[in-house]
Amino acid sequence: VLTSMNYNFLRQAKKINPDIKTGYTMKMSYGGLEDMDAADFFSVKYTYITESFVEHAHSLGKEVCAWTLNYQGDMQRMVNCGVDNIITDDPELVRKVILGTTDRNPSFVSLLGYALK
């Protein structure tokens, strides 16, 4: 797997090896996904991912990876949006969110931290 924020680099890599799995890393969810054949998946900052973005990417045969989620509410939103992968510093919490076994309620401090981002 090769990921990059430089789409031209991914195009060059695909020319050299069309079988390599590539991911385009972006801070925002851009339009024009139809023209991004050199990317097999999109890695997007979670705050810019919507359900419609995920549906559109999936309709093109592309996966969506969300980064970097560390709060339960954000993780649940990404699961609800249908992302294929989640990048986190708390994999145990992601597992619990996916399995629906969380026993943690977001604390006021964590909610405040989220609000001040």
Residue ranges and their predicted role:
Residues 1-117:
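Short loop-to-alpha-helix "cap/lid" segments that border enzyme active sites
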